[in-house]
């Protein structure tokens, strides 16, 4: 089947009014990725496929989001909302190019899996002309029923038109379809609008195809594959399902999640085997954690690379560009952004490291700050191998600290420090004996005078 050409038509023109949002519905996110992009990723998982995007409100934004993950796509605007078949025909120009297979999917079904779409395409390769993706919900009420006779799908009957006997059928229409390209335009053009709403319904092509003697069939997929998102509650439900899938996938691959339900991943999170993740950890986009790493509770990672046997947290934040080498450590209440942390280096507590390079085995004391921004530009801090930065030090970039250098606690470092040097950048302490007693007596007298005056 791999040599069969395919066009995937992604219907993404819905108004999404129930989302009550200025953002187009298909651009709302699950696991950090727009709904429509989840669908496109599933389509791409079936093999090589061109994508035709049918858009409406926010057309350019929708197209841009898809092209970020899929490269250039054809976009077609549905100027009037006259039904699902009408929406598909908005992509007539693309359909007419001639493809072996057509996939018709909805941009608001982010949980559809590539294997479900692949199963539909495989049916086409085996001789089917039209394949409808169906499912069996706990209660079929409200769904269109798939009517089968002799192993063939003969019609889709909506709930309000179904007989009492047909309403007993538990096999329901999931809305997604695959059809042989050579029949596509003829079937779509045969759909009429003789119904109460005067719309062109995609479901009608089943009866039309059956009437033409074509091979029409249905396949069953898990219920969650065809869940459509219409409001924020359903969006949250989809997020829950996606996260549970990801958690199970990772645990089965050798990752330990101590409290799985409290850990949240993004669409592209990569966690290698033998990583241990404690409760209440959040992964934003573009995070890769190598084998043997330990992520403590209440850590937040985004755009970060974590090396083998590294240790993060608790209460650590890794921002985009954080690159931690093997056995390095970023501890509690530390933030690392756009910085390379060398092998075995330690940033144990209460530090901000931004736009920096930390050498191997260096130790960054509590309260260390890389002062990287002057209000206009970012500057770099470079710390060599085996350096020691004393607590409560401020490193004012651009600045370079050499190998084995030692920075005294409380220093403000504004100039480069050579290798093996000791740098002190603070005012000398002055101690005045007995002065504290004098100050206490003075302030007590002032306070007493104020009380009398009241």
From Swiss-Prot:
Mg(2+) binds at residues 108, 230. It catalyses: alpha-D-glucosamine 1-phosphate + acetyl-CoA = N-acetyl-alpha-D-glucosamine 1-phosphate + CoA + H(+); N-acetyl-alpha-D-glucosamine 1-phosphate + UTP + H(+) = UDP-N-acetyl-alpha-D-glucosamine + diphosphate. Residues 233-253 are annotated as: Linker. It comes from the Bacteria. Binds 1 Mg(2+) ion per subunit. Its cofactor is Mg(2+). The keyword Ion transport does not apply. Pathway: Nucleotide-sugar biosynthesis; UDP-N-acetyl-alpha-D-glucosamine biosynthesis; N-acetyl-alpha-D-glucosamine 1-phosphate from alpha-D-glucosamine 6-phosphate (route II): step 2/2; Nucleotide-sugar biosynthesis; UDP-N-acetyl-alpha-D-glucosamine biosynthesis; UDP-N-acetyl-alpha-D-glucosamine from N-acetyl-alpha-D-glucosamine 1-phosphate: step 1/1; Bacterial outer membrane biogenesis; LPS lipid A biosynthesis. SUPFAM superfamilies: Nucleotide-diphospho-sugar transferases, Trimeric LpxA-like enzymes. This is Bifunctional protein GlmU.
């Amino acid at each position: 089947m791999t040599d069969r050409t395919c066009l995937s038509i992604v219907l993404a023109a819905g108004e999404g009014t129930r989302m009550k949002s200025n953002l187009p519905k298909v651009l709302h996110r699950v696991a950090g990725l727009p709904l429509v992009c989840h669908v496109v990723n599933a389509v791409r998982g079936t093999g090589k496929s061109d994508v035709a995007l049918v858009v409406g409100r926010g057309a350019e934004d929708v197209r841009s989001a898809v092209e970020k993950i899929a490269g250039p796509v054809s976009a077609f605007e549905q100027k009037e909302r006259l039904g699902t078949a009408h929406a598909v025909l908005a992509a007539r120009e693309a359909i007419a190019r001639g493809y072996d297979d057509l996939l018709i999917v909805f941009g608001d079904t982010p949980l559809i899996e590539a294997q479900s779409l692949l199963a539909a395409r495989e049916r086409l390769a085996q001789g089917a002309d039209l394949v409808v993706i169906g499912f069996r919900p706990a209660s079929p009420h409200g769904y269109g029923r798939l009517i089968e006779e002799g192993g063939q799908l003969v019609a889709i009957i909506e709930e309000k038109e179904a007989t009492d006997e047909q309403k007993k059928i538990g096999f329901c229409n999931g809305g997604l379809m695959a059809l042989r390209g050579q029949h596509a335009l003829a079937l779509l053009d045969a759909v009429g609008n003789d119904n109460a709403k005067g719309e062109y319904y995609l479901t009608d092509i089943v009866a039309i195809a059956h009437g033409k003697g074509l091979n029409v069939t249905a396949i069953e997929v898990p219920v969650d594959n065809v869940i459509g998102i219409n409001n924020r509650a359903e969006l949250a439900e989809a997020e829950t399902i996606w996260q549970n899938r990801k958690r199970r996938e990772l645990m089965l691959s050798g990752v330990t999640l101590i409290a799985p339900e409290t850990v949240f991943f993004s669409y592209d999170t990569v966690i290698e085997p033998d990583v241990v993740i404690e409760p209440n950890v959040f992964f934003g986009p573009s995070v890769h954690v190598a084998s043997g790493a330990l992520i403590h509770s209440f850590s937040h990672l985004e755009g970060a690379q974590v090396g083998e046997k590294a240790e993060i947290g608790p209460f650590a934040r890794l921002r985009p560009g954080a690159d931690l080498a093997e056995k390095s450590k970023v501890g509690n209440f530390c933030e690392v952004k756009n910085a390379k942390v060398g092998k075995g280096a330690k940033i144990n507590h209460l530090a901000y490291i931004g736009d920096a390079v930390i050498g191997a085995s260096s130790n960054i004391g509590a309260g260390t700050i890389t002062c990287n921004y002057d209000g206009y530009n970012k500057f770099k801090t470079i710390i060599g191998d085996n350096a020691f930065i004393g607590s409560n030090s401020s490193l004012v970039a651009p600045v370079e600290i050499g190998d084995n250098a030692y920075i005294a606690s409380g220093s403000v470092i504004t100039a480069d420090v050579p290798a093996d040097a000791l740098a002190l950048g603070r005012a000398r302490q002055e101690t005045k004996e007995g002065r504290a007693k004098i100050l206490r007596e003075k302030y007590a007298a002032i306070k007493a005078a104020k009380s009398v005056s009241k």
